[in-house]
């Protein structure tokens, strides 16, 4: 989808100011003391693939309805997605009824969700999965449904009562940056006060960047992950723009990420229509390097075996979920090549080499292994395994060695480097 328009509406300012004042004075209220998202969250989210399709009469298989989510839940279990780590089934915008109920609570659209969110959550939980839901900090959601402004506490409690496990909180329709920040903080505190473990996914910095640089130290205190840049769409142009933005701003955003709080470059669009195979490999590899939340947005009923195998690749997922929790970064670029690297636990490193050229055939790229992993990854030597586009063992490399790879246009080679000193210690143990 296009970047959701953060249209500014008057009317929330005074009430938000009051809500902010009373919430900060509550004794013992602590922001995001929830112990969640110790590794990047994984799951499925409807937006990029299904958007805001409300026409269940003409398109019953792709409209936003309980049927869609129940079918996805079934497939997440039966087709190995849950076992691979994808545990959150997440509803995005357009699930709500046009108005709140008589007691001011959000309610699901009665035609598309006739049994309500609580029963859907029960079904999802019965599958061993967790349920995510969507709301907005302002007067309306980005699609025009009721927003949470003025209702932060009641909405947080409603989600907890329903058994929701994750909240994606968008940033449309609020009237100032100050009120935007107050709203995100208030909802974080409100979720904590419910006593239920609810992952808090924010879009706070996304709506700040056009006007001022976000304070990521503060954002991390309130959010489990946060969107920074424009919404992804099913195109190579979109993937490139996200990587370019991330590398340009990496000095500001990389170090703040870690267990409990992650930069979110948006959904995985692997298995859809717009990316070539090599471009899908690039997205999977770089989302692992960036320690990104892995939220697929695709149709699990109609996904190719190749895309499924890529999304369920246990070695790549292990890099994404590495317990050290350090986000990777771009090491170098030039001649249409980029090298990204990420430190891993056990003195290991992940390295991704991208061929950004969009013409011609595969190109060779050679790099000194001494330049990788801050000079220590292969000191005195390392064992290198290629994980993508196909897995193969490349063998031992000394610190003085040079590594040569052939990379397809718009494709990526993903490597794992294991220091031989650490490998010897493992063997001894």
Curated annotation (Swiss-Prot):
What mutagenesis or variant effect is reported for residue 187 to V? In FD; decreased enzyme activity
Effect noted on mutating residue 91 to T: In FD; mild; loss of enzyme activity
GO biological process terms held by the UniProt record? glycoside catabolic process; glycosphingolipid catabolic process; glycosylceramide catabolic process; negative regulation of nitric oxide biosynthetic process; negative regulation of nitric-oxide synthase activity; oligosaccharide metabolic process
Tell me what the record says results from residue 47 to G.
In FD; decreased alpha-galactosidase activity
Glycosylated residues, per the record, are 139, 192, 215
Q: What is the effect of changing residue 247 to P?
A: In FD; loss of enzyme activity
Task: State how changing residue 396 to Y affects the protein, per the record.
Answer: In RNA edited version
Effect recorded for residue 121 to T: In FD; uncertain significance; decreased enzyme activity
Reported impact of residue 315 to N: In FD; uncertain significance; decreased enzyme activity
Q: Changing residue 375 to A: reported impact?
A: In FD; uncertain significance; decreased enzyme activity
Outcome of mutating residue 309 to V: In FD; uncertain significance; decreased enzyme activity
Q: What is the effect of changing residue 204 to R?
A: In FD; loss of enzyme activity
Enzyme Commission number(s) of this protein: 3.2.1.22
Q: Which disease is it linked to?
A: Fabry disease: Rare X-linked sphingolipidosis disease where glycolipid accumulates in many tissues. The disease consists of an inborn error of glycosphingolipid catabolism. FD patients show systemic accumulation of globotriaosylceramide (Gb3) and related glycosphingolipids in the plasma and cellular lysosomes throughout the body. Clinical recognition in males results from characteristic skin lesions (angiokeratomas) over the lower trunk. Patients may show ocular deposits, febrile episodes, and burning pain in the extremities.
Question: This chain belongs to which protein, by name?
Answer: Alpha-galactosidase A
Q: Which organism is it from?
A: Homo sapiens
